[in-house]
Curated annotation (Swiss-Prot):
This is UDP-N-acetylmuramate--L-alanine ligase. GO terms for cellular component: cytoplasm. It comes from the Bacteria. It is found in: Cytoplasm. The keyword Cell cycle applies. One of its GO terms (molecular function) is ATP binding.
Length: 512
């Protein structure tokens, strides 16, 4: 990057070729090292022997974890933080005027997007990428869990923690000794164009991130291109119309090594153009049992032998998790795990952190935290909640994520949230956006949309409450024995769980 040129940060620009390896980076500095995706990559490079440090705005569980590994984290972003670095890594949340970007540019240092680091880590590995609007973290976590149980010791880069036994969490990054790497492939900024995986899993192609892609056609085209870069197999859900449209748009040579999956029986589907098909025969969860029963009908193209009908009993609820399991198990079998071993391991998977994660129970009121931040994810979450807690009142505190997403999907959010009994909408988590650019968008945008739904929202109490702490106390006051309260969203709503549990204990507590 020339020092005389203006600073342009392009996450789609590929900085490395297939021959590059971690040792080529030299001392590496991460801007925003505590971010979900950044911390995982920093930890993996550290395990590869690269000298890693970073900066962030504030302490977090992620930065604490990195510091325990011996990685230096500076708090506050300043020019001097990059003085010793040869490579500086940024995410799409970092702007060109960031003081560390400016200093690195002035010094002629190598500046690369986080996706460049992930692409480099894939070099020389059998890489499995998991892309899609929904289900990336759960699917990649489940696949990693299956492979670990199979003794493969995979590397994995997952944008979150994995639920372990007894309420523990396992880190989402690991540099294994095996030749497999499992990674979430973030489609939000187009940077997954750099990846050339052995297996490309596409969990869902429903429209999202239209602030980047502009329209649904360009969004779907990005998935078609991503599938075309897979050197082995493509695994794609066709339960949604957009997924089926992507499959239909694939060139014939790509379809020939594509495995579609879904809940519709094969004979009821249109011609798949030569793609194989995994049918998910899902049985309803026995009310309140905590077990999702299904049968996967795996074709010969997956098993490399005779077709197999494999029973699976999942501890993660909902039809959406049956789909996630179909993708994870299919990929594991393609990588050499037996169908039975893959299914057994999937049955011991407890979920990714912040995915239907029970945080506590007070006075017979259960608090569950979930990352859902798209209308389809919220609908799937609440459907699963009704299956898991059939006799309970379902209450939701929802923090919208991004003003643009709230604007695009206000009516869809209202319709999905109508599946709950009580809903409070908190202030919007801005992430990379600014309220000033969306002056008319607020929690009331969704509440107003709900008012126009008529029958769909009948019986659902829904209110806007900007302050999350106040929202938690209000919901605690409304709760009764046997209720389930969900904190929902991709922002910092998860930090309210302890406030909510404390408020439930006393029905009054300050947030101080």
């Amino acid at each position: 990057m020339s020092q005389d040129q203006p600073i342009v940060l392009d996450p789609t620009y590929a900085s490395f070729d297939a021959a590059a390896r971690p040792a080529d980076l030299g001392a590496t500095h991460f801007i925003g090292i505590g971010g979900a995706g950044m911390s995982v990559l920093a930890e993996m490079l550290h395990a590869e022997g690269v000298a890693v440090d970073g900066s962030d705005r504030a302490h977090s569980a992620k930065t604490d974890r990195l510091e325990t590994l011996g990685i230096t984290v500076e708090f506050g972003q300043r020019a001097e933080n990059v003085a010793q670095a040869e490579t500086v890594v940024y995410s799409s949340a970092i702007k060109p005027d960031n003081p560390e970007i400016v200093a690195a540019h002035a010094a002629g240092k190598r500046i690369v997007h986080r996706s460049d680091i992930l692409a480099l880590l894939m070099n020389g590995k059998r890489a499995v990428t998991v892309a899609g609007a929904h289900g990336k973290t759960t699917t990649s976590s489940m696949l990693s869990h299956i492979l670990v149980n199979a003794g493969a010791d995979p590397s994995y880069a997952i944008g979150g923690f994995i639920q372990g036994p007894d309420g523990t969490t396992l880190d989402g990054g690991h540099a294994g000794k095996g030749d497999i790497l499992v990674a979430e492939a973030d489609e939000s900024d187009g940077s997954f164009a750099k990846y050339h995986p052995t297996i490309a899993i596409i969990t869902n192609c429903e429209a999202d991130h239209l602030d980047h892609y502009g329209d649904e056609a360009h969004y779907r085209a990005a998935f078609v291109a991503h599938a075309g870069r897979a050197t082995g197999h493509v695994i794609i859900s066709i339960d949604d119309p957009d997924g089926l449209a992507v499959l239909e748009a694939l060139p014939a040579d790509v379809k020939s090594h594509t495995v579609a999956y879904g809940t519709t029986a094969r004979e009821s589907l249109p011609d798949l153009g030569g793609a194989a098909y995994v049918w998910i025969a899902s049985e309803s969860e026995t009310a309140g049992s905590g077990v999702e029963q299904l049968t996967l009908h795996l074709p010969a193209a997956v098993t490399a032998g005779e077709p197999v009908s494999q029973s699976v009993a999942l501890k993660v609820p909902g039809v959406h998790n049956a789909r996630n399991a179909a993708a994870a198990i299919s990929a594991a079998v393609l990588l050499g795990v037996s169908p039975a071993d893959a299914a057994n391991a999937a049955g011991t998977f407890l979920g990714a952190a912040r995915r239907f994660q029970v945080r506590g129970t007070v006075k017979q009121v259960t608090v569950v935290d979930d990352y859902a931040h798209h209308p389809t994810e919220i609908a799937a979450l609440l459907d699963a909640a009704r299956r898991r807690y059939p006799d309970s009142t379902i209450r939701v505190i929802f923090q919208p994520h991004l003003f643009s997403r709230t604007k695009f999907f206000a009516h869809q959010f209202a319709k999905s949230l109508a599946k709950a009994d009580d809903v409070i909408i908190t202030g919007i988590f801005p992430a990379r956006e600014k309220q000033a650019d969306f002056p008319d968008i607020s929690p009331s945008t969704i509440v107003d949309a709900a008012a126009g739904l008529k029958d769909a929202s009948a019986g659902t109490w829904i209110q806007p409450v900007e302050d999350m702490c106040l929202a938690a106390k209000m919901m605690a006051m409304r709760a009764h024995h046997g209720d389930v309260i969900f904190t929902v969203g991709a922002g910092d709503i998860t930090d309210m769980d302890q406030v909510l549990l404390t408020a439930l204990e006393a029905h009054r507590e300050s947030c101080e």
